[in-house]
């Protein structure tokens, strides 16, 4: 999603921040620059869109989505670009599909996971039954308005899509845009030249220099449609009693974070304590998130053996799961972001998570879900727990703090340290 500019048309510095160079040089004294940045420099407007009369399926937009779509439509048709910043479950996919329908242009969706590509295909055929969905490649020059191409950045790496190989006008949708503005993905984005651009993310932020890429490609705050949708859940913050002894680098002296995750993952007593706590809620359909694949497998075995219930796993190349299973265990990378499992009513954080936690909490799509949030005995883990607690408070969750001795699973039933109460009045845990 680049603009091709002559270098002599650029007054000032090229786009970038810190270590992030957000441009690539082209022959003839030109450069490919991020879409929104280039549009501002050129002062150009997008070409007019000619909506096609396409019939919707059985899915219709909800009132709160119509207001968001109206704002997004204004940005895309007047500037050419927009960022939809809406929480998980708000309906960003369907709003993007409706905007595509109204534009009447072929579309390309960039997403970084196959499971998300499958969800796009299924959503498109539900929402717009006449859609032709292709899960590889990019729109050719003769692509039709009903043609939707869904692909990953890896397939476009080392390619430059020439203007003559693409439609004169097409919409580019970037799903989970915060993930697709990494150093490698930015080079891919600079190889695509759409006429209209839409970014989707519940958390459009990065923790490195490439945070600047989000504004350069999708526009600043005045091009962002921002919504919140608090969903109160019942949260149990469980002090496990497990003491973590991290390792430290002999060279830098810094904590080896992998050693912390390994200590959490290689603790069968801790797994059993979590399983026993989850069994106290047999009516909840759990999603358990882990960092390591070996932990996913062991946790699934523990849950299956202690419950006698159906347990499924999600990791690696596995994209399908049993929606009737009592518990689905997956990695954060597989099931923590963009994962659409509306049937899940419980979330267990079997390994620590800090950044982008809002994405994980968003896997619970309905109000009144259950969250089991274990906290081990280590300063940085307690700090991450406080960060997650702030997210719970913002969502209006009810928080209950308990403790257990995870070294003795047979006695692992949590003991309350404070009564259940609304989040704003949550007590601090005793130290």
Swiss-Prot record:
- List ligand-binding residues for ATP: 86-93
* UniProt keyword terms in alphabetical order: ATP-binding, Helicase, Hydrolase, Nucleotide-binding
Q: Name one GO molecular function term.
A: ATP binding
Pfam families given in the database record: ResIII
Chain span(s) of sequence motif DEAH box:
175-178
Query: Which segments show compositional bias classed as Low complexity?
Result: 407-424
Domain Helicase ATP-binding as annotated: residue spans? 73-222
- Superkingdom is Viruses
Q: Report whether Thylakoid shows up as a keyword of the record.
A: no
- Residue ranges of region Disordered? 403-431
User: What InterPro entries does the record tag this protein with?
Assistant: Helicase/UvrB_N, Helicase_ATP-bd, Helicase_Restrict-Modif_Enz, P-loop_NTPase
Its EC number(s): 3.6.4.-
Query: Could you tell me which PANTHER family the record lists for this protein?
Result: ATP-DEPENDENT HELICASE IRC3-RELATED, TYPE I RESTRICTION ENZYME ECOKI R PROTEIN
From the Swiss-Prot or TrEMBL record, give the protein name: Putative helicase 055L
């Amino acid at each position: 999603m680049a603009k091709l500019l002559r270098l002599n048309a650029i007054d000032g510095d090229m786009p970038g921040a810190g270590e992030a160079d957000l441009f690539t040089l082209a022959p003839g004294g030109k450069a490919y620059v991020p879409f929104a940045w280039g549009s501002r420099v050129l002062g150009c407007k997008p070409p007019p869109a000619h909506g096609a009369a396409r019939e919707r399926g059985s899915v219709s937009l909800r009132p709160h989505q119509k207001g968001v779509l109206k704002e997004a439509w204004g940005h895309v048709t007047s500037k050419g670009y927009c960022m939809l910043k809406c929480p998980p479950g708000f309906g960003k996919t369907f709003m993007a599909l409706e905007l595509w329908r109204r534009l009447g242009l072929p579309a390309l969706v960039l997403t970084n996971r196959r499971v998300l590509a499958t969800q796009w295909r299924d959503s498109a055929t539900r929402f717009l039954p006449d859609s032709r969905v292709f899960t590889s490649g990019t729109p050719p020059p003769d692509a039709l308005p009903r043609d939707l191409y869904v692909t990953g950045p890896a397939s476009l790496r080392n390619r430059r899509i020439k203007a003559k190989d693409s439609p004169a006008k097409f919409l580019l949708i970037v799903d989970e845009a915060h993930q697709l503005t990494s150093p490698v993905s930015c080079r891919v984005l600079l190889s695509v030249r759409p006429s209209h651009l839409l970014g989707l993310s519940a958390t459009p932020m990065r923790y490195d220099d490439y945070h600047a890429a989000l504004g350069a490609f999708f526009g600043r705050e005045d091009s962002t449609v921002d919504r919140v949708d608090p969903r109160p859940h019942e949260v149990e913050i469980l002090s496990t009693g497990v003491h973590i002894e991290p390792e430290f680098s002999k060279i830098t002296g810094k904590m080896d974070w992998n050693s912390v995750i390994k200590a959490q993952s290689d603790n069968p007593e801790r797994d059993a304590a979590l399983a026993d706590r989850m069994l106290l809620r047999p009516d909840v359909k759990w999603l358990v998130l882990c960092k390591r694949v070996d932990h996913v497998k062991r946790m699934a075995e523990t849950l299956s053996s202690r419950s006698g219930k159906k347990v499924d796993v999600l990791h690696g190349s596995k994209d399908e799961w049993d929606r009737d299973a009592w518990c689905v265990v997956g990695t954060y990378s597989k099931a923590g972001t963009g994962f659409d499992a509306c049937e899940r009513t419980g979330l267990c954080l079997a390994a620590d998570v800090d950044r982008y936690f809002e994405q994980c909490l968003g896997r619970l799509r309905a109000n009144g879900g259950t969250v089991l949030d274990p906290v081990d005995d280590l300063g940085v883990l307690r700090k991450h727990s406080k960060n997650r607690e702030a997210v719970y408070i913002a969502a209006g969750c009810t928080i209950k703090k308990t403790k257990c001795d995870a070294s003795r699973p047979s006695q692992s039933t949590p003991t309350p340290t404070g009564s259940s109460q609304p989040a704003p009045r949550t007590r601090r845990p005793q130290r």
